Amino acid sequence: MDYILIGVILGIVQGISEWIPISSKTQVLIVSLSLLGLSFSVAYSFGLFMEIGTIAAAIIYFRREISGLLKALVRMSSRREDYLLLKFLVIVTIITGLMGVPLYLFVISLPILGLPMTVLGVVLLIDGIIIYLSRKNYIPRKGLHDLRLRDIIIVGIAQGLAALPGVSRSGITTSALILLGVKPEEAFKLSFISLIPAALGAIGVTVLFSKHEVSQAVHSVSLSGLLISIVVATFVSIFFINALLRFARTNKVVVLVIILGIIAIISGILSGIAKGFY
């Protein structure tokens, strides 16, 4: 088995799917099951572990915002925006953890209950419809400074639901922000930055509660394959972050929304067809 090639494929899948409204966990899960023959729990743990590449991409792309956050953390920033972003991330991350950890512990037990892969496709379809409707029915104009505590808690709850396989973290978080009236570019940006603490927490929880599965996943691909997948995911992610934010700044937001919604829906259908459940 060519682990280098598999690492490249998994890296591309992770790098693309993390930023558009298709669940990166689900896509990596399907590829891992198809190419590597991993068990559901091992493949799911591997999908979360692979987010190292997308975390690196977000840190690199938003390095100025991260620098501002660090200054705000030690009260050395003179920008109100840095403190607002820090408040946003702290609250969202806490709520995400309270929602996501119990859901993760539930998910890793699902194979015992016989969860069919078709459920993943159905959840993706629902996710795509929510994303489409949220953008169709609202004209968002808010920025970070307009968000109230209740709004931030809602975003945290939405991001926590992404612990479920089939739910797109970026999709559901961006949709929640736009439903709350946040401008598309700002919604994408906040969603992408909030990935960093959420994904770090997800990796920590995965290693803590699924050490055996993580070990199996790493050995199934080999260390070199894993490293290559992370590097590829990082570069692909940077490209997609830049492309989505640039597109969100244009007057073609409706086109972007329709494309993302269609991708989410088609992805769910193809996922089911690929596994023979439709």
From Swiss-Prot:
Database matches in InterPro entries: UppP
Keywords recorded for this protein, A-Z: Cell membrane, Hydrolase, Membrane, Transmembrane, Transmembrane helix
Main location group: membrane
Catalysed transformations (reactions): di-trans,octa-cis-undecaprenyl diphosphate + H2O = di-trans,octa-cis-undecaprenyl phosphate + phosphate + H(+)
UniProt keyword Transferase, yes or no: no
E.C. no: 3.6.1.27
This protein's GO CC annotations: plasma membrane
Protein localization: Cell membrane
GO molecular function, one term: undecaprenyl-diphosphatase activity
Enzyme's top EC category: hydrolase
TM stretches of this protein: 3-23, 42-62, 88-108, 112-132, 152-172, 190-210, 225-245, 253-273
Topology in membrane: Multi-pass membrane protein
A Pfam family reported for this protein in Swiss-Prot or TrEMBL: BacA
Role: Catalyzes the dephosphorylation of undecaprenyl diphosphate (UPP).
Family: Belongs to the UppP family.
NCBIfam families given in the database record: PRK00281.3-5
Matching PANTHER family: UNDECAPRENYL-DIPHOSPHATASE
UniProt name for this protein: Undecaprenyl-diphosphatase
Organism, as annotated: Saccharolobus islandicus (strain M.16.4 / Kamchatka #3) (Sulfolobus islandicus)
Gene: uppP
